[in-house]
Amino acid sequence: MDKFRVQGPTKLQGEVTISGAKNAALPILFAALLAEEPVEIQNVPKLKDVDTSMKLLSQLGAKVERNGSVHIDARDVNVFCAPYDLVKTMRASIWALGPLVARFGQGQVSLPGGCTIGARPVDLHISGLEQLGATIKLEEGYVKASVDGRLKGAHIVMDKVSVGATVTIMCSATLAEGTTIIENAAREPEIVDTANFLITLGAKISGQGTDRIVIEGVERLGGGVYRVLPDRIETGTFLVAAAISRGKIICRNAQPDTLDAVLAKLRDAGADIEVGEDWISLDMHGKRPKAVNVRTAPHPAFPTDMQAQFTLLNLVAEGTGFITETVFENRFMHVPELSRMGAHAEIESNTVICHGVEKLSGAQVMATDLRASASLVLAGCIAEGTTVVDRIYHIDRGYERIEDKLRALGVNIERVKGE
């Protein structure tokens, strides 16, 4: 397995161009199965999960090409089963199920894999499809969905806020007969982006970005060209990297209005932040950040995917900060690894109490999930000496060319090929 070797400490300075959002690109790629004409999707990041999704769409019979943009022609889809060998590495493949059953009346997806963060059941996807009239069976490790004729619009109240299930229900409802209302819907920018993509193809959707989404079913969806929004988590990760290194950075191709909660906390930590239409600058003026208290919750609150990065910020900040995780259990696996680098933290149920230290020391650490592993790489950027981060395949699932982007900001980082 590949590793990163990072020599620190470095003060990050310069510009970084933000990639398209993985968490919008994936649902949009699967939503392309609904289209009866070719679609072009721009600003799709080059990531392992994206490659896996494109491979999966090809196996279903879609024509998929990448030349800058991703081109998908799903007219000839004739296989309705997403097999285990592709699904096992990636939870997002569950998003193939709704479009398949909505357009073709049948679909089956192997139960998914992905990051090992807490319980992420597919129950909410299943109950949403059942409420739209699909028959669901769980057999031999597969979720099998079918419907006679079209799905039927329904008034669906989500038991809990779920980005994944909101995507499944919204995509499926675009081709259902009648109107679907989703109450307690997820409000994430990636949901809005997926809805806007579907609207480009001819879907009738309103209320995306609120907790009540209304979808009027249409007979068919056509083609179109759509640009994926910038990755707010990648943006936030680079902003934190600059903040903890007391540096100065400009993020280009960013979307500031998707990061309100994160930018507010960075300002609390002492960062001087300016924003334009598609850029964000951060300058620490050489100062050490101040500890901040953070509580994760569904959008528009503070995102769970930025929790590990802010845990690290607090561990090198002035003072003591509390980080409370309310979205996923089992999401503090980076904390013991950071302790090996000299960090002082205590975990009490779903809260980490961070006591800031002046500096970290390089160490050998291991990545456990996508965002935790990013925080270990950032720790290596500011630690004294050499840090080796093992199991970085987690990072490759969510960050495009992170080492090249860090190098351009002055970091001494190299990828060491594994056995």
From Swiss-Prot:
Which GO biological process entries does UniProt record here? cell division; cell wall organization; peptidoglycan biosynthetic process; regulation of cell shape; UDP-N-acetylgalactosamine biosynthetic process
Q: Which Gene3D superfamilies match?
A: Enolpyruvate transferase domain (3.65.10.10)
Q: Which residues carry this modification: 2-(S-cysteinyl)pyruvic acid O-phosphothioketal?
A: 115
EC number of the protein:
2.5.1.7
Pfam families reported for this sequence: EPSP_synthase
The record's section on PANTHER family has:
UDP-N-ACETYLGLUCOSAMINE 1-CARBOXYVINYLTRANSFERASE
* The name this protein goes by in its record: UDP-N-acetylglucosamine 1-carboxyvinyltransferase
Source species: Shigella dysenteriae serotype 1 (strain Sd197)
